[in-house]
Amino acid sequence: MSDFGNPLKKFKLVFLGEQSVGKTSLITRFMYDSFDNTYQATIGIDFLSKTMYLEDRTVRLQLWDTAGQERFRSLIPSYIRDSTVAVVVYDITNSNSFHQTSKWIDDVRTERGSDVIIMLVGNKTDLSDKRQVTTDEGERKAKELNVMFIETSAKAGYNVKQLFRRIAGALPGIIKDDPVEPPNVVTMDPIRQRQIVTDEGSCWC
């Protein structure tokens, strides 16, 4: 039986990874089904929210987009601390960003222990001719670290919906069916909130 009348369950997803791996682009593709070719580094932390309709309930996903630059690293543990899901993103054309995912995952487990869902995401599959990290390498690391794994392209939209479907299926108390969207229901319910502004006059991205 559907419990659409019950209060929304809220789950916090924090996106982590090196600068320019595509964290913001993945969120933008999921929220708005769009892609911005103009790169602008995230300043501080951005927060967005979207309602997702599952087989047996409705949930609100709170998406926290973190900056990859070193100068913002000290801010990130406080955002990891109460998260349900950590999405650790790397760029398949940048082997260093892949190697750094081990550190990001360590940071998550330092703050959350084992009480967290971790998804390792290899982004930018549209640039396969420049690939430096194979799919097998990503799968092996995910298995070694006991985390989930998927490859995506925020630019092409490849596997982005599947990424969030798999996350939704792994959420605590959620039956692991693919989420469905009831007909004639608008699911995009974005709330954007600037959490931290460190550079005066900077624009969000």
UniProtKB/Swiss-Prot annotation:
Taxonomic classification: Eukaryota, Metazoa, Ecdysozoa, Nematoda, Chromadorea
UniProt subunit comment: Interacts with GARP complex component vps-52. Interacts (in GTP-bound form) with lin-10. May interact (in GTP-bound form) with eat-17.
Superkingdom, natural source: Eukaryota
Pfam families noted in UniProt: Ras
InterPro entries, alphabetized: P-loop_NTPase, Rab, Small_GTP-bd, Small_GTPase
Record keywords, A-Z: Cell projection, Cytoplasmic vesicle, Golgi apparatus, GTP-binding, Lipoprotein, Methylation, Nucleotide-binding, Prenylation, Protein transport, Transport
Similarity field: Belongs to the small GTPase superfamily. Rab family.
SMART domains documented for this protein: RAB (SM00175), RAN (SM00176), RAS (SM00173), RHO (SM00174)
Binding residues for GTP: 18-25, 42, 66-70, 124-127
Annotated phenotype, changing T24N: Constitutively inactive (GDP-locked form). May abolishes interaction with eat-17. Diffusely distributed in the dendrites and cell body cytosol of neurons. Disrupts the punctate localization of lin-10
Expressing tissues: Highly expressed in body wall muscles, pharyngeal and vulval muscles, hypodermis, intestine, the gonad, coelomocytes, and neurons, including command interneuron (at protein level). Highly expressed in the terminal bulb muscles.
Function: The small GTPases Rab are key regulators of intracellular membrane trafficking, from the formation of transport vesicles to their fusion with membranes. Rabs cycle between an inactive GDP-bound form and an active GTP-bound form that is able to recruit to membranes different set of downstream effectors directly responsible for vesicle formation, movement, tethering and fusion. In its active GTP-bound form, acts redundantly with rab-6.1 (in its active GTP-bound form) to positively regulate the retrograde trafficking of cargo molecules from endosomes to the Golgi compartment.
Keyword Lipoprotein: yes
Residues bearing a lipid moiety (S-geranylgeranyl cysteine): C203, C205
Name this protein carries in UniProt: Ras-related protein rab-6.2
Changes seen on gene knockout: Grinder formation defects, whereby the grinder is formed, but it is small. Animals have a fragile cuticle phenotype, which is prone to rupturing at random positions along the body. This phenotype is intensified in response to hypotonic shock. Due to a compromised cuticle barrier, which increases permeability to exogenous chemicals, all animals become paralyzed in response to acetylcholine agonist tetramisole or the GABA agonist piperazine.
Compartments, record wording: Perikaryon; Cell projection, Dendrite; Golgi apparatus; Cytoplasmic vesicle
